[in-house]
Curated annotation (Swiss-Prot):
Its main location: secreted. It is an enzyme of class 5 (isomerase). It comes from the Eukaryota. GO terms for cellular component: extracellular space. Substrate binds at residues 33, 65. It comes from Trichinella spiralis (Trichina worm). This is Macrophage migration inhibitory factor homolog.
Length: 114
């Protein structure tokens, strides 16, 4: 049930048409989760400042039940930053990604919890 949320000040018109599908595939791959459980949400056109500048930037959160752990987050970070830089043109030094490991009992789905 990975959820990747990205807040960015880039315009919606600058997001490639395949961004959601390619990001979903990447998240499923790096976390070894089925694509049918992956959710991706991008909030564009945000009023956002990074380092005192409003040049292109982003703040993201990757949440998952499992797969998020200190020994793997550096690799997750490298792959996500490469992807976001390539797809959206945001410099790697103008993004933060917060990794959150969730307990299945704290996540609702289909009328129950995991």
């Amino acid at each position: 049930m990975p959820i990747f949320t990205l807040n960015t000040n880039i315009k919606a018109t600058d997001v490639p048409s395949d961004f959601l599908s390619s990001t979903s595939a990447l998240v499923g791959n790096i976390l070894s989760k089925p694509g049918s459980y992956v959710a991706v949400h991008i909030n564009t056109d945000q009023q956002l400042s990074f380092g005192g500048s409003t040049k292109p930037a982003a703040f993201g959160t990757l949440m998952s039940i499992g797969g998020i752990e200190p020994s793997r987050n550096r690799d997750h970070s490298a792959k996500l930053f490469d992807h976001l830089n390539k797809k959206l043109g945001i410099p790697k030094n103008r993004m933060y990604i917060h990794f959150v490991n969730l307990n299945g009992d704290d996540v609702g789905w289909n009328g129950t919890t995991f």
